[in-house]
């Protein structure tokens, strides 16, 4: 009766785990950021949403943006849009934003014709810079 033996072992392990980890503690509670005190952002941190038009898709724009943002210690993300534009959200020292765009445009292929922007509240939980929409 192997099944009875395994069932007994499983029940025993389940009881042991329940005694160690109370049921009210969820496995991913550490991800509930709203329940934790947010990290303190450096003074002057800004988050900005950019909608960028021009020759910005199929030319390495997103990867150049990621490289530049990481080099400048900025966080955020970049994503291609269906209308041919690119959306870029960047957070950090706003004095570095012009250099970010200068680094992105150091390409024979990227041509920015229009940039629309709006300020957003900073996200204290954000870490790193990602390329969305592979």
Predicted regions and their residues:
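Intrinsically disordered, low-complexity, mixed-charge
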Residues: 14-134
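Extreme N-terminal basic, low-complexity initiation segments
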Residues: 1-13
């Amino acid at each position: 009766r192997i099944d009875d033996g395994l069932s007994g072992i499983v029940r025993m392990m389940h009881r042991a785990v329940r005694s160690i980890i109370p049921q009210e503690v969820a496995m991913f509670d550490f991800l509930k950021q709203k329940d934790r005190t947010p990290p303190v952002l450096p003074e002057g941190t800004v988050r900005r949403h950019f909608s960028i038009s021009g020759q910005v898709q199929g030319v390495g724009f997103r990867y150049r943006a990621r490289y530049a943002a990481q080099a400048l210690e900025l966080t955020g993300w970049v994503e291609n849009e269906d209308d041919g534009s690119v959306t870029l959200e960047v957070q950090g020292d706003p004095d570095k934003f012009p250099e970010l765009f200068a680094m992105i445009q150091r390409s024979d292929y990227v041509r920015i014709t229009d940039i629309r922007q709006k300020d957003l509240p900073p996200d204290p939980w954000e870490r790193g810079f990602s390329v969305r929409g592979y």
